[in-house]
Amino acid sequence: MKGQNVTLQDIAIELEDTISPINLHCEEEIETEEVDTPNPFAITATCYACEQVLRLAVVTSTEGIHQLQQLLFDNLFLLCAACSKQVFCNRRPERNGP
């Protein structure tokens, strides 16, 4: 500050002195990475036991939906609510694990 009375110009001069001399407004561009955002997908499959049509809605990435597709083609099977209830209710509770 210069003198007894503080002016806006004095404060601005002090700020200029404390600011780093590095030019932060350079023309360098940073590459942005593409992020695979989750998307909604509708899946139609059939029940493993009774072949009733099942419809699922999931939200996942493109990679996630490909992984699910591979599981459904390989060795993952879905059950409808009725078949699931029948399978799990007819088992003893201690056998409901792996």
Swiss-Prot record:
A zinc finger (unnamed) spans 47-83. Highly phosphorylated. The keyword RNA-binding does not apply. GO terms for cellular component: host cell cytoplasm; host cell nucleus. Gene3D superfamilies: 3.30.160.330. One of its GO terms (molecular function) is DNA binding. One of its GO terms (biological process) is symbiont-mediated perturbation of host cell cycle G1/S transition checkpoint. A motif (Nuclear export signal) lies at residues 65-73. Keywords: Activator, DNA-binding, Early protein, G1/S host cell cycle checkpoint dysregulation by virus, Host cytoplasm, Host nucleus, Host-virus interaction, Inhibition of host innate immune response by virus, Inhibition of host interferon signaling pathway by virus, Interferon antiviral system evasion, Metal-binding, Modulation of host cell cycle by virus, Oncogene, Transcription, Transcription regulation, Viral immunoevasion, Zinc, Zinc-finger. A motif (LXCXE motif) lies at residues 24-28. It holds the Pfam family E7. Residues 1-37 are annotated as: E7 terminal domain. It comes from the Viruses. Coiled coil: none annotated. It is found in: Host cytoplasm; Host nucleus. Signal peptide: none annotated. Its main location: host cell. Homodimer. Homooligomer. Interacts with host RB1; this interaction induces dissociation of RB1-E2F1 complex thereby disrupting RB1 activity. Interacts with host EP300; this interaction represses EP300 transcriptional activity. Interacts with protein E2; this interaction inhibits E7 oncogenic activity. Interacts with host TMEM173/STING; this interaction impairs the ability of TMEM173/STING to sense cytosolic DNA and promote the production of type I interferon (IFN-alpha and IFN-beta). HAMAP family: PPV_E7. The E7 terminal domain is an intrinsically disordered domain, whose flexibility and conformational transitions confer target adaptability to the oncoprotein. It allows adaptation to a variety of protein targets and exposes the PEST degradation sequence that regulates its turnover in the cell. Belongs to the papillomaviridae E7 protein family. Plays a role in viral genome replication by driving entry of quiescent cells into the cell cycle. Stimulation of progression from G1 to S phase allows the virus to efficiently use the cellular DNA replicating machinery to achieve viral genome replication. E7 protein has both transforming and trans-activating activities. Induces the disassembly of the E2F1 transcription factor from RB1, with subsequent transcriptional activation of E2F1-regulated S-phase genes. Interferes with host histone deacetylation mediated by HDAC1 and HDAC2, leading to transcription activation. This is Protein E7. It comes from Bos taurus papillomavirus 4 (Bovine papillomavirus 4). The gene is E7.
